[in-house]
Each structure stands twice: as C-alpha cells, then as structure tokens.
Amino acid sequence: METMPNWLMQRAFLTPDRTAIEIEEEKVTFVQLHEKVVSVCEHLTHVGVKRAQKVAVLMKNGMEMITVIHALSYIGAVAVLLNTRLSREELLWQMDDAEVVCLVTDQEFETENVPVCSFAEVMQGPKAEAFIQEEFSLEEAMTIIYTSGTTGKPKGVILTYGNHWASAVGSSLNLGLRDDDCWLACMPMFHVGGLSLLMKNIMYGMRILLVPKYDANFIHKALQTRGVTIISVVSKMLTDLLERLGEGTYPSSLRCMLLGGGPAPKPLLETCVEKGIPVYQTYGMTETSSQICTLTADYMLTKVGSAGKPLFQCQLRIEKDGVVVPPRAEGEIVVKGPNVTGGYFNREDATHEAIRNGWLHTGDLGYLDEEGFLYVLDRRSDLIISGGENIYPAQIEEVLLSHPAVVEAGVVGMADESWGQVPAAFVVKSGDVTEEEIIRFCEEKLAKYKVPKKACFLEELPRNASKKLLRRELRKLVEEM
C-alpha cells in the first residue's frame, strides 16, 4: 500500500511562513492553516467523527470550509461535498445515498434523517484528543462528489488520495510552477474544479486568493492588483471579465486562464487571442479529478477551439461502438490515467458501464485531429438527432454568440413530428433583435437542418454553481411551450 506524508502537515513543515490562503484582507500561512485544522479535528472528534466514516459537508467557500475538508482528511474520514444550490430533497437524497453519519454545515438545515453539526456550534463546544493521520494511503477514498446528474440520478464519484495527487502532479507538469504563483479560486469548492485548487495549494505551496462568492467586479480588479498568475474560469465568467476589460488587457503576470466547463465559443477565444489573454482551454470532469486534457497557450492561435492533449500521465482516444476510430472521425471520448476514479459509490452497474479495462467512457462526443489534439463536440445526452442527422448544440450556440446582440445562448432539441427533433434556441440579448432576425442570421451560417426552429428570449440562462449551462432546465421550458 503506497503512502505519502499528510500533505498539509508536510507543507507546514517545509514552508511554514509562506502565505497559504488570502480571503479578502485576511492572510493565513501554512503553519497557521495547519493549526486551525488541528483545532477543527479536535472539535469534530468530540462530536464523534471517526476514521473511515462518511461526513457530508454543506458549506460555502471560505476558511471554515477549507479547514473542515482538511480536518476530515486528518481524521481519515471521507468528505461528501454537497452543492449548496441543491434543494432540500436533493440534499437529503445524496446524504442517504452516500450513507453519511452526519452533516457539517454553516447553514440552517434541519432533518431527522442525519445528525446535523452546525460548524459554529461545533467550534464553540468542547474538544477531544484527535488521532491524526500522519500518512495518507493513496488507495483510500478522500472525497465523494456527486455528478451534476444531467441524465438520471446523480452518482457519487469516489476520488482517492491518489486520484487527487495525480491530478495536481499532472497539472503542474502541464502548466509549470513558479515561486510567485497565485491562483484565484472563484469556483465552488464542492465542485471538483474548486476542490482541486485546495489540493494544489498544499502540494505546490502556492498562494490561493479565495473569492467566497462569484463577483465579476472583484475578480476583474483582483486580476489587475493582487498578483494573480492563474485563474480557473468557465465561458460565462470569461465573458463577464471581457465585458469589464473593454479595450484594455490584463497584466503580463497573469500567465494562465484555465477555461473549462464545456466547449467554448470560438468568438470568445478569438477575442482573447486579440487581447493577448493566455487562455488554456481544458477538458475534465468530476470522474477525472478535474482536468485531464489541456491546450497550452503555445497552440492558442493555431488550435482555436481545441481542448488540447492529455496530461502527461493520461491517455485519451475516440471510440465508436467499442472500436477506436481514425483522426477526424467523431465518437465517444474515452480516457485513462491515475487521476481517473475507480468508480461510483454503491453503483456497481454504473461503474461497470462507465469503466471498462481501466478506460473511462465519458459520454462526451469529440474527435482528434491528425496531431492528436482533442476537439470536444458535446455531451452525448445533449446531441440532437434530426431526421437521422447529428446536430451539436455547441455549434449552434457558437453561431448565436457571434451575433452582436447576443450575450448568452443555449440550444436543446424540441420534439417534431416530421424530423423527430429540431433545434430550439434560448437567447439573452443585449440589444434590439427579433426572433426572425436571429433565425435569419443562423440561416446564413448553418446547414438548414441545424437552424433553430424557435428562438426564445430569457433574462438569464439557467446555470449551476459553476456557471455551466443547465440544458435540462431549457428542455423543461421547451416541454411547456
């Protein structure tokens, strides 16, 4: 059984006085963070948290959540990270599914299903001597994070210490490390993209500027004034920042904007190229502990729209009906690597369906070019099949977003008696534009069968906490038409 020293303890020993976390005006060094975590361990031990138990965490981004996540790893308990935007029923379902022994939260939450530990009350209560893991076994589960459930019930993705370690190592081999690196963290830590930054923070000894709640104005200013070198974003966040940037650009010290969350519209990427903003388009998911494929800035100009090549320890191929297809042929993206989950909690059927011979079948569609660069087309479940033709919503959204009066766009399939399905578009507009003009604009740029048959205007598009588009909500709107 392969082990490593407890990551935060080791970091506090190696670089105790280096800044670990900045939140607003508060700065915490690695040794101070370790001391805070030990204190949380002792309080959690008093309320009965033990090694190997599963503990639900329902908290917002902040020092409290950081210390709880680390404290559970110190104790050897498994952190089940819950999305704060879910309904009460959804949260209860996930806690029941994960078989948690208690819930640690910074919010009002009452239930008889599971003991609820208010973080503030726990910290005001007594302490008990805690047995702290000085070593981590890389094979043991560290976290369970539920997939967003874009199709069917969410599944609890088990990520081991080894998965998180491999993810951080793979990222560093790809993006490089600098002594002055500071990663601005604005993604929720209950999602793997946000959580992965906590892992990088202690493994790299890198400063994190944590934004408790998404605030585009604060982030825009911080990129200019707080020495930020790296930031993780999705397309919506990047669009918000570019709006605020206007004709300007960001300091050269900002060396990487890691762009994930699904295929990015080309007009957005081209704007970044024009402004010299170093966007690294990336592809990953909960099951891969964050990114598994990234396009470095070297190829920003020549491979616009690509998610790049696999991280150093990872492999990727495209399959159709179980057969690896040649370059440019579309199929399912299949990946393998030490950062890839071994399976879903209590879901052997789903695990066997998704992971075959060590390869994870992602359910995403894409192709590789002749040089091995990945182009992500869409989720297989989002595919619109119209009269036997495959239509990728992301392609139509890209066209819609190139219209000067469109700021957001989402496309889903709509039932049609003749064709089975036809595209329907949902648009957030910034100026005067009609449904007819939108459809006419698409007719000039798309094959006839890809042109939306309806274009509906919304004040905003439904998105999850990571700002990813929720197509299932758009499908509900279509059904109500």
From Swiss-Prot:
This is 2-succinylbenzoate--CoA ligase. The keyword Nucleotide-binding applies. One of its GO terms (molecular function) is ATP binding. It comes from Bacillus mycoides (strain KBAB4) (Bacillus weihenstephanensis). Converts 2-succinylbenzoate (OSB) to 2-succinylbenzoyl-CoA (OSB-CoA). PANTHER family: LONG-CHAIN-FATTY-ACID--COA LIGASE, NONRIBOSOMAL PEPTIDE SYNTHASE PES1 (EUROFUNG)-RELATED. NCBIfam families: menE, PRK03640.1. The keyword Cytoplasm does not apply. Pathway: Quinol/quinone metabolism; 1,4-dihydroxy-2-naphthoate biosynthesis; 1,4-dihydroxy-2-naphthoate from chorismate: step 5/7; Quinol/quinone metabolism; menaquinone biosynthesis. Its EC number is 6.2.1.26. Belongs to the ATP-dependent AMP-binding enzyme family. MenE subfamily. Keywords: ATP-binding, Ligase, Menaquinone biosynthesis, Nucleotide-binding. It catalyses: 2-succinylbenzoate + ATP + CoA = 2-succinylbenzoyl-CoA + AMP + diphosphate. SUPFAM superfamilies: Acetyl-CoA synthetase-like (SSF56801). Pfam families: AMP-binding, AMP-binding_C. GO terms for biological process: menaquinone biosynthetic process.
